[in-house]
A protein has these predicted regions:
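An amphipathic alpha-helical interaction surface
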Residues: 93-177
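Membrane-proximal alpha-helical anchors
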Residues: 1-66
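Solvent-exposed, amphipathic alpha-helical segments
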Residues: 44, 53, 87-90, 119
Length: 177
């Protein structure tokens, strides 16, 4: 083997190693971005303002008109609604753009999203009419509809049942630890 062939071989090995390294770095970056998105999601749910707002929303009576919601919650309560719906909006956008998976959202928030939408639909409709903006809470609605579609094909199963000792998912969890 002459020196030129050896140099070409070394060059090919170096380029291949570089491509493999770059692919590994990209994969690791994507995993980190997914983890960061999930942590951000958890943090949004753990803020005192969000928790207070969600509690106020889920305590609303079903089918309450927008005026009833305003009367029950008052101006500060309406501010809390904006905070909760903005969080759902953000999660909807992140899901649509592939930054979060529907599985993660379902694990964290399926119940609160669906209950919030059920409680706030009349209020949202009124706000859209009042401000002539059908885009008000558009991603919240989109997200709630995706969650409803998901539950229409497979009913929600609590984690303590779906991942109980003896299930395949529990066994997978044990092996990942």
């Amino acid at each position: 083997m002459d020196i030129s062939t050896l140099a070409n071989l070394i060059n090919a090995v170096a380029v291949t190693a570089g491509v493999i390294f770059a692919a590994t770095q990209i994969r690791d970056y994507r995993r980190q971005r997914k983890r960061d998105s999930m942590l951000s999601l958890v943090r949004s749910f753990q803020s005192p303002t969000f928790a207070r707002g969600l509690r106020r929303v889920i305590e609303l009576p079903d089918n309450a008109s927008a005026d009833q919601v305003r009367e029950i919650l008052g101006p500060e309560g309406e501010d809390l609604i904006v905070h909760v719906t903005a969080t759902w909006e953000t999660i909807g956008v992140l899901l649509f753009h592939g930054e979060l998976t529907i599985d993660i959202i379902d694990d964290f928030f399926s119940g609160p999203i669906l209950i919030s939408w059920r409680k706030l639909l009349p209020y949202t409709t009124d706000i859209r009419q009042q401000y002539q903006r059908d885009t008000w809470s558009e991603w919240f609605q989109w997200l709630a509809e995706r969650m409803m579609e998901r539950e229409s094909t497979a009913p929600a199963v609590p984690a303590y049942i779906a991942h109980a000792r003896g299930t395949k998912s529990y066994d997978r969890w044990l092996h990942r630890r």
